[in-house]
Amino acid sequence: MPTYKPTVFKHHQRRDGKFRVSIRITHNRKSVYMPTDVYVSRKQITTDFKTIKDTEVVRMIDRDIIEYENILLRNLGSNLSQYTARELADYIEKYTTTDGGA
């Protein structure tokens, strides 16, 4: 079963000073990062960039993670172990961009 973690990278800073939040998907000891449409300012994260402090942002990201889990469980079920982290991320991306298209 994959695990998920919201991640912010220092080097992903926009010109307006905000940072894009990505979701790290780890499966079978391999990780991939899926970018989100969520951006945070320095005030909304800890100084070490490890934790998002803004609870509203955390709720939004948690909703995305729950959606990702539901997509995988509903469509792939117990076959998750057959896929790589990259394949799972690609599947989620395909499914979310086509609104249920897989």
Located regions from the model:
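N-terminal helical hairpins
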Residues: 16, 29-102
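Short, Gly/Pro- and small/polar-rich lid/capping loops
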Residues: 1-11
